[in-house]
Curated annotation (Swiss-Prot):
Belongs to the UPF0320 family. This is UPF0320 protein YNR077C. It comes from Saccharomyces cerevisiae (strain ATCC 204508 / S288c) (Baker's yeast). Induction: Induced 4.5-fold when shifted from galactose to glucose medium (at protein level). The lineage of its organism: Eukaryota, Fungi, Dikarya, Ascomycota, Saccharomycotina. It holds the Pfam family DUF468.
Length: 84
């Protein structure tokens, strides 16, 4: 696997209260059929599970179709690089 899989991860443990993270933006970039995640831990998994199973992702997350900006405005920046 190549590149940085997770960068700029939110520094605090994730809670299931979406209102705690009103400015949390996630940017997903696709570069291949497979994906790699290198920093899964006790709060990354609940985060991914939560955003995939609730309206939280539709309310607070911005998912562009193109590559994310090089300099995100918010420090809370999740970058998924999908590689072969």
């Amino acid at each position: 696997m190549h590149g940085t899989c997770l960068s700029g991860l939110y520094p605090e443990p994730f809670t299931h209260n979406s209102h705690d993270y009103p400015h949390f933006n996630i940017y997903i970039s696709f570069g291949g059929p497979k994906y790699c995640i290198t920093a899964l831990n006790t709060y990354v998994i609940p985060l991914l599970h939560h955003i995939l199973t609730t309206q939280f992702i539709h309310t607070y997350f911005n998912i562009p179709t193109k590559s994310p900006p090089k300099s995100p405005k918010h420090k809370n920046y999740l970058s998924f690089n999908f590689t072969k």
